[in-house]
A protein has these predicted regions:
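Acidic/polar-rich alpha-helix caps and helix-coil junctions
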Residues: 1-158, 163, 201, 205-403
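Extended polysaccharide-engagement surfaces of secreted carbohydrate-active enzymes
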Residues: 155, 159-161, 166-172, 187
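Generic N-terminal initiation segments characterized by hydrophobic and/or small/turn-forming residues
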Residues: 169, 190, 307-310
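Short, cationic low-complexity segments
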Residues: 172-192, 199
């Protein structure tokens, strides 16, 4: 049987319901190392906030969805997950307004504990105490795997000892180049992205140019590290693997970090008129970055930035606050494979592709690298459906517009 395509609104509603219900069932605390790789309620809460964010965003075409209500729902979940305000089962599920089955049937289907009612309050401290920001210069190291900042992490190593080790590469939007000295995500940042890092200490751990920084040589006697001298002049270096850290093949992939959720929450707070609270929330992430410039940070010696030039975000009106939060998110998550989806949900993908086409990068070899030149608005935001799937459906599945 071939199932016809659901509408975008139906799809989002299904995902949202699934995540809300899963929060009732998943473990509230983080898993121990021997259990690592399993998702807990914190991961589901982070994903729910991200789904609600997309539903509220201008680039997601949901004409029958109240986007203001979705912003408020992001804030509601953020107050539970981040600020520790308890929430009722009814408010979590939106049961009264969205369910047609009885509570008895629903609670039995979900295998909830006996005595759980719609008025049962969920203790926020169970999840709030499980996640926090880790040190920025450690979260992408081997030692940073399964840190309190990690909400969803794909386990590539068998910590349980039952012989199921999977030696895959990372599941990122790019491919990994392996050599004896290092491993690097082979997707090149733009010079425009690099310019966003002016006076930001996170640049050292995110983007590198052809100059070889001593930070990356501290673990090797080799005076040069090959990938700095490859064709592209800029490289993402967040996932650099020092020789002492072993093979890149067993590195985990963090799907979602607590820092991203803080910035999602900050954006939502600003959208519902709480701009000062939004700035305070975004500054939790920015203040963590400032710790890279602390005198007691051993990696400060590799920085060329003065702590006096890196300041917290200031309180400002809505538009300025929104731009500042989006910029903070772009910097914090650069090189983690989220940017394309970010500009699509913001509704600015067409103008960003035009910018790339109008400002082509020139390689050190002299070759022009053109991106965005053939982008078609309203078509290329999504991929085509494989034609074989369209064919075997006998007309039930229709190809995406423009393909």
């Amino acid at each position: 049987m071939v199932v016809p395509r659901s509408t975008l609104e139906e799809t989002y509603a299904y995902i949202e319901k699934d995540l809300r219900e899963s929060i009732l069932l998943l473990r509230k605390q983080r898993y121990q190392l021997s259990e690592a790789g399993q998702i807990s309620a914190g991961g589901a809460l982070g994903l729910l906030m991200k789904v609600l964010l997309y539903e509220a965003s201008p680039g997601v075409d949901l004409p029958n969805v109240d986007k203001t209500a979705k912003w408020n729902e992001v804030v509601e979940i953020g107050k539970y997950f981040i600020e520790g305000q308890n929430i009722s089962v009814n408010d979590l599920l939106k049961f009264d307004s969205r369910y047609t089955e009885s509570w008895d049937d629903a609670s039995e289907r979900l295998f909830l504990e006996e005595g759980t009612t719609l008025e049962t309050m969920m203790n926020a401290q169970d999840v709030v105490s499980s996640h926090s920001l880790s040190k920025f210069d450690e979260i992408f190291r081997i030692s940073g795997e399964f840190s309190p900042e990690s909400l969803i992490e794909i386990n590539q190593y068998d910590y349980s000892g039952v012989g199921i080790n999977e030696e895959h590469g990372w599941l990122l939007n790019g491919y990994i180049t392996y050599d004896p000295e290092s491993s690097i995500l082979n997707v090149s940042p733009t010079s425009e992205l690099q310019s966003q890092f002016e006076n930001d200490p996170r640049e050292l751990f995110t983007i590198s140019d052809r100059s070889i920084n001593d930070y990356y040589k501290q673990d090797t006697s080799n005076p040069e590290i090959g990938w700095f001298n490859s064709g592209n002049s800029l490289k993402f270096c967040k996932f650099y693997v020092f020789p002492s850290e072993g093979s890149a093949k067993m590195r985990n992939y963090v799907v979602m970090r607590y820092a991203e959720v803080l910035l999602i929450y900050a954006e939502a707070l600003n959208e519902v008129g709480l701009s000062r609270e939004a700035v305070d929330m975004a500054n939790r992430v920015r203040n963590r970055a400032a710790e890279l410039l602390d005198d007691d940070n051993p990696n400060k010696q590799y920085q060329t930035i003065s702590a006096a030039n890196f300041k917290p975000l200031s309180y400002a009106p809505y538009n300025i606050t929104r731009d500042a939060i989006l910029k903070e998110k772009r910097i914090e998550m650069a090189g983690e494979g989220d940017r394309w989806f970010e500009i699509c949900r913001l509704g600015i993908v067409s103008e960003r592709m035009k910018y790339l086409a109008d400002n082509p990068a020139v390689e050190p070899t002299g070759q022009t690298r053109v991106r965005g030149l053939h982008f078609k608005k309203g078509v290329n935001e999504i991929f085509p459906i494989p034609q074989e799937e369209v064919f075997i459906s006998n007309g039930v599945i229709e190809q995406n517009f423009g393909y």
